[in-house]
Amino acid sequence: MFANTTNAPRIGVFYDGNFLLHASNYYNYIHPQRRRLSLNGLHDFISQRVAEEEGIDPKRCRVCEAHYFRGRLNAADAAQRGSQLYHDRVFDDILMSEGVHTHYLPLRNIYGRKEERGTDVWLALEVLEMALRGKIDVAVLVVADTDYVPLVRKLIAMGVRVMLISWEFEYTNDEGARIVTRTSHELLNLAHYPVLMQEVIDCGIEQ
């Protein structure tokens, strides 16, 4: 725990959009609760958890920056996927209502498949810029990939505390394939405040 008796920490939350969507889909379609993740609830939880870890009054702990990064289809491709455009707009409205800044890159056509490229680099650059400008004291990363390890190491060297919001789960999909989601153990070990959200959520449900 960091003892902070004077200044309220400035919290920045940074979402890997694909990871967040994957986790939200799991809770909406697979988990017994059958409910999507609430961004408002997640931000409230983050504020409370940072306050607890930093040893300050929760009332003085608020998310001041929130950014969402994801690759997405262009309008023409999305229009060919039924209600994709509508659902994208609905989620954009949710992000906007929570004050989350969106950062989109077009999906690339790689060997006939639409794939995401460059969003992890963009996320890392955005976090580093805010850290260098002194706009955040705590970087909350909603990510899972080992690719983010250099970012976390750099933030630690700069004196920025890192909270890692992670999920781990597995299930069998409709095609019978086993889907496994794991967070990089190196990320979990590096972060000042690693949070295993599946345990937090399941514990809250049991209570």
Q: Which role fits each region the language model picked out?
A:
Residues M1-E115, R161, E168:
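Domain-level signal for Mg2+-assisted phosphodiester chemistry and nucleotide/NA-binding surfaces
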Residues R89-Q207:
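Nuclease catalytic cores that cleave nucleic-acid phosphodiester bonds
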